[in-house]
Amino acid sequence: FYEKEGLPAFPMGK
């Protein structure tokens, strides 16, 4: 997930 949909930036391989 990303901080674009108001979600917490999870430590994932974007």
Curated annotation (Swiss-Prot):
Q: Where in the cell is it found?
A: Plastid, Chloroplast
Which keywords does the record carry? Amino-acid biosynthesis, Branched-chain amino acid biosynthesis, Chloroplast, Magnesium, NADP, Oxidoreductase, Plastid
Is this entry keyworded Signal?
no
Enzyme Commission number(s) of this protein: 1.1.1.86
If you read the UniProt record, what top EC class would you report for this enzyme, in one word? Answer: oxidoreductase
| Cofactor requirements of the protein | Mg(2+)
Subunit description? Tetramer of similar but non-identical chains.
| Protein name per the record | Ketol-acid reductoisomerase, chloroplastic
Q: Which organism is it from?
A: Populus euphratica
